[in-house]
């Protein structure tokens, strides 16, 4: 764009110079014809035109010089660089090794742990695989939490009591024979928990007993033919027939025959 504008300005200057030439030729012709008043006016106008053209050219050259002095590319914004901690690789490796040594020392110091709820001492065996895991981790290990009692019978203990109980060793009471210090430690130490969990036997629900109702036996007595043939008004005769014995029935049958 800047080259195009300069080219247009150069063309306009050429045209102005040509017009001034034609104007000068015209003035010379008028001077030959003894027209002094017209010549004076024309010379004054020519002087004004030349002065204006000189001013315009001076402005153009100054603007072109400033454009060449300035870079055409866009101004680059300098980013504010944040202060970085330029540490040497030896220093970082030294810090890395020191952190691993501190981690290993803390793990070795936490080997003899005592469980307050069960009172058993145990030691963590460190293998090569554990050492590799410790080296790979850069953060410190989390503090060991006490195991949760599944039965929930024991109340929750304070954190200070837990730390104090870890520092004191467990001494069995069987080894103390008349030693007061040993007996005091034996009393303070936690009780030994059973090796096996108690087996819970499920209770059998008793089945409800079904009581049978007693069966009533009905005795059917034979009625005689007379009792059947008697009219309904006579109520005493059928009762006698019902209450009569089987021998009486046989006698009646023989008499009828």
UniProtKB/Swiss-Prot annotation:
Per the record, ranges on the Cytoplasmic side are: 1-37
Give me any GO biological process, just one.
virion attachment to host cell
Q: Where are the transmembrane segments?
A: 38-66
Q: Which GO terms describe its cellular component?
A: extracellular region; host cell plasma membrane; membrane; virion membrane
Question: Residues of the signal sequence?
Answer: none
Q: Mind telling me which residues the site (Cleavage) is annotated on?
A: 65-66
Which Pfam families does the record match to this protein?
A: Glycoprotein_G
Chain positions covered by the region annotation Disordered: 70-166, 193-257
Q: Residue spans with biased composition (Polar residues)?
A: 73-90, 98-123, 150-166, 231-243
User: Which residues pair up as cystines?
Assistant: 173-186, 176-182
Keyword field:
Disulfide bond, Glycoprotein, Host cell membrane, Host membrane, Host-virus interaction, Membrane, Secreted, Transmembrane, Transmembrane helix, Viral attachment to host cell, Viral immunoevasion, Virion, Virus entry into host cell
Tell me which parts of the chain lie in the Extracellular compartment. Answer: 67-257
Q: Where is this region: Binding to host heparan sulfate?
A: 187-198
Q: Which residues are glycosylated?
A: 72, 80, 85, 87, 92, 105, 139, 163, 199, 215, 233, 251, 253
Query: Would you identify the family this protein belongs to, as annotated?
Result: Belongs to the pneumoviruses glycoprotein G family.
Task: Write down what this protein is called.
Answer: Major surface glycoprotein G
């Amino acid at each position: 764009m800047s080259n195009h504008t300069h080219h247009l300005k150069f063309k306009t200057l050429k045209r102005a110079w040509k017009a001034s030439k034609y104007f000068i030729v015209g003035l010379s012709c008028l001077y030959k014809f003894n027209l002094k008043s017209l010549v004076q006016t024309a010379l004054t106008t020519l002087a004004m035109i030349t002065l204006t053209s000189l001013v315009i050219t001076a402005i153009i050259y100054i603007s072109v010089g400033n454009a060449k002095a300035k870079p055409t590319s866009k101004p680059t914004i300098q980013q504010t660089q944040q202060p970085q901690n330029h540490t040497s690789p030896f220093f970082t490796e030294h810090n890395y090794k020191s952190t691993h040594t501190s981690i290993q020392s803390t793990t070795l110091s936490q080997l003899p742990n005592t469980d307050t709820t069960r009172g058993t001492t145990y030691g963590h065996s460190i293998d090569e695989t554990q050492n590799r895991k410790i080296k790979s981790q850069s953060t410190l290990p989390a503090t060991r939490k006490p195991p949760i009692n599944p039965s929930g019978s024991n109340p929750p203990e304070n954190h200070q009591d837990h730390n104090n109980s870890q520092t004191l060793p467990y001494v069995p009471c069987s080894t103390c024979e008349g030693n007061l210090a040993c007996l005091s430690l034996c009393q303070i130490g936690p009780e030994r928990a059973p090796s096996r969990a108690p087996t819970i036997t499920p209770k059998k629900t008793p089945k409800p007993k079904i009581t049978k109702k007693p069966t009533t036996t009905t005795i059917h007595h034979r009625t005689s033919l007379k009792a059947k043939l008697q009219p309904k008004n006579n109520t005493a005769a059928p009762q006698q027939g019902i209450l009569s014995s089987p021998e009486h029935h046989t006698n009646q049958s023989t008499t009828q025959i």
